[in-house]
Amino acid sequence: MTLLSRRQFNFLTLAGGIAAGLGVTTAFAAEETSVVLLLSGGIADGGWGQHAYEGLKSLEGKPGFKIAYAENISQAQIPQVARGYADDGYKLVIGHGYEFGSPFLEVAPDYPETNFFVSSFLPQPEVPKNILYADLAYFDVAYAAGALAALISEKKASVGFIGGGDNPTQQNMMKAFVAGAEKTVGGVKGVGIVTGDYNNAAKGKQAAATMIGNGADVIWHAADVTGLGAIQAAVEGNVKVLGCYSDQTELAPKNIGTSFEMNLAGMVVTTAEAVAGGTFKGGIEWKPTLAEMWLLRAGASGDHNPETVSAEAWASFQTIWKDITARKIDVAAVLK
């Protein structure tokens, strides 16, 4: 019997969830399915952009797919770039991140035969039927990260969040992190800085260093390249750190507790397969659970590093993780 790795299992779970929501079938249309991935950052950021790109690249090995990507797209450029690929006949245009939500609302109605997917929240109750949005449990994972940060803090004084672009998603992730920390361990203060930039490691390092200087002894980021600077500051400041979007253990093997890895590759593949199968369904928001969308990874140690996370802290965290997944902890309520 072939055993599945946790990554494989999570991919299959995600695929099943999307299949149920989009009506994915395994019989694809004979014609070519062209897919383009649009990113505000780069494909080599070690996480958010890279994992989505890896999913896109994996389509090259599947019959009937044509792929393209464009990176480092500014907010002002989004409509023009999206229209360009739609004009070229691409069947699926993926906007990877919050920045694409509103611009796609303007573009999609002009291209009813093109499918659009945004890996971010539904921006308004009614949207065109050819756009699919997604609530990828960002706030749930931020609350969980805050809880774990508080549990593994040695000083039990302060833990910090480093954010990227200044948008509602990042602001609410910061709020959820703070709530998770402060509700989990009494006396711990959650602090956060949204740097306004996803692609500036120097900003991330400076922000994290400031927090560490003010007493924070655990840092978590959700800031792509900017977050790499935060990890560096944690190493130099000899404090604990939590990774995001990918397994970042190798960047700080002695400091990292775990990484919250996002199954972005599976998201891209299964959405593309829905389009290929003719069963893509837009006009809605897909909502996977925390455990469906996120993995806990710590390199060779498994799901956590026992050198930085005690058995007691991990057991408490696991209960919180399961309760969020089961909706017993209502993270959305703490953001109101």
Which stretches of residues belong to each language-model region?
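N-terminal secretory signal peptides and thylakoid transit peptides that target proteins
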Residues: 1-17, 23
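Sec/Tat signal peptide C-region and signal peptidase I cleavage site
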Residues: 24-29
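A generic secondary-structure boundary signal that marks alpha-helix termini
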Residues: 18-19, 280
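A residue-level marker of the well-folded mature domains of exported/periplasmic proteins
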Residues: 30-336
